[in-house]
Amino acid sequence: TGIMLKSSEYKIDGFWYYFDENGQFVAGRWINHHNADYYYDEQGHMYYGWKQEGDKTYYLNKGNGKKVIGEKKIDGFWYYFNENGEMATGWSQHNDHMYYYQANGQMTYGEAKIDGHWYYFKEKSGIMATGWSKHNNHTYYYQLNGWMTYGEKKIDGKWYYFHERTGVMATGWSKHNGHTY
């Protein structure tokens, strides 16, 4: 005689299985238990790693199988998974900051041209820069929407000039359109 497993997980021959309220092992579907989502493959094994479902991508922790929600560093790259565990691509606002995730889900760092506009994403955090930024041994100014500034710009009551192609702030004396900078 044996004990029927119900609404619990059990390790058999090195694989974790989940048994539902009727004692049947779950296969090929998501289960929520321990306040987290898990996926069990067609053989009933707990699933780990990347999971693609249609146009949505998920990641299940390699150590415990939990679906990731929030920021996660995977193989040296940062990703973001929304409240449903779906991997972010494109623009994402969280932690009171803007970020941009590439088509493969990896966080963007440094200068990036997106939809025809140049942005700068801080090297350590990936946060979109606004206001003054010093990088590549130059000074730049990014508008509130993150766009790099070009040409003449009055900032805090002072006029500045930013190169028309590179956005680099002019240093030393420079005259443009009747203004001396």
Each PLM stretch: what is its role?
Residues 1-181:
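Extracellular adhesion/carbohydrate-binding repeat motifs centered on closely spaced tryptophans
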